[in-house]
Amino acid sequence: VLGRLYVILDSLYVDEGDMLKVCEKILKGGADVLQLRAKDWEKGRIKKVAQELFKLCSDHNVPLIINDHPDIGVLFSGSHIGKEDIPFDRAKEILKEKILGVSCYDNLEIALNLQEKGVSYVAFSSPYPSPTKEKELSGFELFERAREVLRIPFYAIGGIDEERAREMIRHGAYGVAVVSAILKAKDVEGATRRIRDAIYSSI
């Protein structure tokens, strides 16, 4: 079962040379799932960095998810796809039993449909403004409703910090996906730990 704190290591915030160091701090802080998102990197570079991150993640029993590229994700723990990426059925074919997560934005119907097709988890847009996600804001009702009908983990993404993590869990989210509140923090390990504590104390 996937844990509740999902951290995205994004190349927009972290230089390639710092990835391992930052990853280690995130893992020490207690992240449950780690995703490598490097939208502007070519595949060879993603694969090379992922191999190094995967060793660290494995030491902490944390899955490493690759944003997009199921052909790379299958070498590690799995992939996460959005609507501009590869179709779900094709990704599932490549990944087989590996983790496959999908961005559902503010669409619960898509999530329900994917649940029947064997998606591992889904992510919904949080109601908060976010520096990394351009989106329609979704309300808390989406999460309250999702809690009633989804059997899979579902994460809130977008503008999540410590206080908002608490709020999202109270409004029904299974977990939260965090980018800038951790990657831009002066103390990455401490920020990760505080958000983790906020989540698990709000369940």
Per-region residue spans from a language model:
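Short, glycine/charged-rich "phosphate-handling" switch motifs in NTP-dependent
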Residues: 174
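Flexible, gly/pro- and Lys/Arg-enriched active-site loops
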Residues: 83-89, 126-149
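Catalytic-face loop-and-helix region of soluble metabolic enzyme cores
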Residues: 144-147, 153-154, 159
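Basic, gly/Ser/Thr/Pro-rich low-complexity segments located predominantly at protein N termini
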Residues: 130, 144, 163-164, 180
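Short, loop-centered acidic/histidine patches that primarily coordinate divalent metals
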Residues: 125, 159-160
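Conserved N-terminal beta1-alpha1 strand-loop-helix module at the mouth
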Residues: 1-88, 93-120, 152, 160-166, ...
